[in-house]
UniProtKB/Swiss-Prot annotation:
UniProt xrefs under InterPro entries: NCMAP (IPR038940)
Organism of derivation: Homo sapiens
Name by which UniProt lists this protein: Noncompact myelin-associated protein
Region feature Disordered, mapped onto this chain: 60-102
Membrane topology: Single-pass type I membrane protein
Keyword Cell membrane: yes
Amino acid sequence: MTTATPLGDTTFFSLNMTTRGEDFLYKSSGAIVAAVVVVVIIIFTVVLILLKMYNRKMRTRRELEPKGPKPTAPSAVGPNSNGSQHPATVTFSPVDVQVETR
């Protein structure tokens, strides 16, 4: 009959390797988190720059497009035509307001 011999050295060796592997994972997890944060910041920055460029492009396009002639005011045909056919539009232009400080 053969008897099995205990493998005490092998158990210690595998436990030691597991500890080294876990240490490596713990140490590299901080680097992985830092890399993910850096990538997120880079993506956010690229999206922000693209949005600013798009906004600038659209603003210049709106400012440079030719303005059409002003629509003529409809003449009142009868007493019941008080602008009910065409809704009134209100255009608001923001103006710099300067408040005096005392």
